[in-house]
Amino acid sequence: MLELKNVSKQYGTKQALKDVSLTLPRGEIVGLFGENGAGKTTLMKCILGLTSCRGTITLDGEPIFRKNITRLSFGTSEHSFFPGLNAKDHRIFYEDHFPSFSEKRFQVLMDFFALPEGRRIGSFSTGQKNQFEVVLALSQGADYILLDEPFAGNDVFNREDFYKVLLGILEPSETVLLSTHLIEEVSDFISRAVLLHQGQIAGDHDVQELEESGRSLMDVIRQTYQYRSDRVLQALENLSDVDGPF
C-alpha cells in the first residue's frame, strides 16, 4: 500500500501542496483531477522523491528509498527517456536496471503504438514521445504506475484504443495513478477519483458509488470546482459591449 500523510510542498511563497493525506491500495486505477496548478504533478514528484516535501510517504510501511523505488514507475509529458537513444537501447537499459522489466509487454505496446524501434526517441513527434513514455512506465514491472498527462498529443482514437489495451494488460495487483484533464474519457474505467484544489484534497470518490447514487463524475467535479456555465455567455456579452456586434 502506498500511503501519504500530511504531505506539504512550498515553492517560495506558493503553497503547492498542503497536508495531503492519501492511501492507494494495490489493484486500483485512480484518477487524479484538478485545475492547472492544483498540485497534481508536484504530488507525483513528491511520491517519487523527485522533489523534497514535508510529511511522510511510505510503501508498505517503509520510506521510499533506493531498495523499493523500482516498485514505482513514472510516465510524464515532461519526458524521462534518453532522447539520443532508440527504443532498443532503452529496452536493454531497462532490462539491466529493472529486474521485473517485461520485454513482452514492452514489445506489445511498441507494436500497438506502431513506434519505430531503430529511431532515436528525440526524433519522435510529441505524441510518439508521450506514447513511448507510457510504454516504459507500463513495462518496468512496477507495482505502482504514475502517469502524468500521458495522452497529450494523441488523437481520440489512439486514446480510446489505449484505454482498452491498458485494462487488458494490467495485472490485478498493479495500481495506476492517472493525472489527466480528460475526465469523461477516463470515467468509465477508473475505480476512484481524487480531486485536488489549491494543493489540498477536495474530494475522494468511489466512481461506482457515484453512479449508483445517480451522479456522474463530471457533476461532482463541476460542483467541487464551482464551474460556472454562464461564463462563456458573459464573456461574449462583454466583448459585444466593447467592440459592438460581431
Regions inferred by a protein language model and the residue ranges of each:
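Catalytic Walker B motif of ABC-type/P-loop ATPase nucleotide-binding domains
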Residues: 145-149, 154
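Conserved ABC transporter NBD signature motif
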Residues: 55-68
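ABC ATPase nucleotide-binding domains
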Residues: 208-246
